[in-house]
Amino acid sequence: MNSLSLSGKSWFLKKYNQEDVTFIKDNYSLDEITSKLLSIRKIKKEDINSFLNPVVKNFIPNPNTLIDMEKSSLRTYEAIMSNEKIGIFGDYDVDGASSTALLGNYLHELNLDFNIYIPDRKKEGYGPSIKSFKEFLDKKIKLIFTVDCGTLSFEAIDFAKKNNIDVIVLDHHQSEIKLPDAFSIINPNRFDDKSNLQNLCAAGVTFMFLVSLNRELRVKKWFQDNNINEPDLINYLDLVSLGTVCDVVPLTGLNRAFVKQGLKIIKLKKNLGIKTLLDICKIETNPTIYHLGFMLGPRINAGGRVGKCSHGANLLLNKDPKKSYSLASELDQFNEERKILESNLLQKILNETKTNVDDPVLILSGKNWHEGVIGIVAARLKDKLNKPVILISLENDIGKASARSITGFDIGSVIISATQENILIKGGGHKMAGGFSIKIENIDKFKNFAIRRFKNINEDISKEKPIFLDDVISPSAINLEFFNKVALLSPFGPGNPEPKFAIENLKTINGKIVAKKHIKSTLLGKDGSIIKTIAFNSVNKDLGEYLLKKNNKLFNIAGKLSLNEWRGQSNVEFIIDDISVNKNFKNTVPSSIG
């Protein structure tokens, strides 16, 4: 289907192999749509069962495939045997909070004491500092774990080593060829790691470490000798799935298994902090990726963005219901403050940005922009403009930046290279996001550096992307049975995108604005079927205007299915991404994704 739409995008039907579809239907007892979706995703026949039923034990490799894993487990065992004090330094985002809680809750289950340190974003910035490690030193801590950070923390780790403190880094951010002089660095994205686990977030890396440590303690008969029940690590997958979803890593292989099983653990509400957040958010249905990514995650992140940076980790570690409710309530309030700050800054930038809009990498700066929200505003602009965006908050003669990128442009690599060339003071990140500090006098130099790197990419990765559709369905297919067939391929996310469908020849019965920015509408199909739809953030846009006006013209919609659960009732609605009034469809797809 090739159709120019209200958004100016072309629609294309994805290709599938009919022989494969027939084989899958006949041999796996699956229906037409599920078989077609598996064919489109090019799932190998021998992998179909594991894809539809991803289980961690079937995907997880020997943790020792990660460099430094074995020595880290042995060092931690020695610390436990010697009653050494343990410190955990975590990042202030969801992945950092989840990783801190994973390690902390495990140590708690072993009846071991530990101290955590979450830096203040505004005062201390990202990653360990000499100041933070001095606090550990004053508490006579001899073993420090850094989680979701540490790979580029040369000064702090040198300070620790000089003071006879061992540092174990559990991270996933890209490294330089030179590594800090830590006791060990477990990071699938360190330059010399060959584990093929580069898509793990920090929570995934931390879980791998716990698997290794748990095995070490079992082999050494520590549980038996100390009359302590061995922890069931499956119960920790709620935290792993939370970090995995909120850090937006690819949901393929092991990550997909983490999330699939993790959602089941979240449903059991074993973690008091997660349970309290679910209650605060009034989530009464089975938790989904949406709930993690758009409801729980933003609240945990809000502490690090505009409130108290340690609240997220403390909530996920907490065992007291009253304290848990207090922390979750504060995070909920911080999130409301974050929304206002974000909206104001986004509007300010959109109003003032008249230059640089044609640059392939948009780099903007402003005095005293709130450091806690520039990252999320950069993400909004990146989605709107479909290009990498870097926002720099200026204070005195230093700028602090947050970057968000698009597929095909490795922003973490760009930041590390610019740091090595002394354009930046310090910085780091991964393929899709990063951060750095810079002298104001070097901003133009960095801008030229980033744009030059972008232009070295052969393909035009920033051009407007078409909408790729998995199938054209009838209005009568919008029901619970069809939704459940599609949901067999979940969880959906990067690497396993949610299926998109087109529905042809519809009329609007009615439409209304909800929450001041969305359009709910009721549509009528040629077959007489009535479907409920919603178009998010469509007010004052062509899409929204079309749905609100009365006309008898037939039109087509593209989007995805959504399950609405309310008071025990389940209804399927269609989320509209785009509208086309063109009837000239053809079953073609660009050869690039054939």
Predicted feature descriptions by range:
Residues L4, L74, E78-K85, K323-S329, ...:
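Mid-to-C-terminal polyanion-binding domains and interfaces
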Residues S153-F154, D247:
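Intrinsically disordered, low-complexity regulatory tails of plant transcription factors
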